[in-house]
Structures are given as C-alpha cells and as structure tokens.
C-alpha cells in the first residue's frame, strides 16, 4: 500500500489545472473530458472561489452543452452566489436533458425557497 494514497489524486488535479490554464490562454489544443471539468469546478468550489468555478463552468458548458451535470453545477454555484433567477434558467435547461436526477429537484427547491 502506498505511503501517500492521495498523492496521485493531487498530482492529477494539478495536471488538470495546468491543462485548463493552458487551454484558457490559447496555448494548447488539448481536450479536457467532462468529468475532468467537474473535478476542476469542485476544486474551486471547495476553495470558495465561486467566480473562478463559474468561469470554468461556463467554459465546460461551451464544450459540453448537453451535459445536465454541468448545468446543475452551474445552477448550484449561482444559488451560492444568490443569483436565483439565473440558477432557475439553468435548472430548466438541465431538466430538459435529464428529468431523473434528484439533485435537480433539490436545487430547484433551494432556489425557490431562497
């Protein structure tokens, strides 16, 4: 068993962040997968860097416009930013793509009750 089991995850995240920075700056024509974007968004969200997380989410949605998971992340971040009407817009878009995700209805409730 590895002495540092989380080192691989940290190294992977560091590489993803570098890849995103290069892509954003136009220095790379690399491809970032949808789940990798989700990891980057979660990283900024956990650090309470909501503006940065929203920026990554916008870029990710431009690459994956039919991803209900990314639309839900965007709505969640908007709710955290107290932008409830915008959040509801993205929740409605996500609902068109996936009506079975329970997080959709939890976030809708949060937005309406706020």
Question: Residue spans of the language-model regions?
Answer:
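Canonical positions in the second alpha-helix
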Residues: 60, 93-94
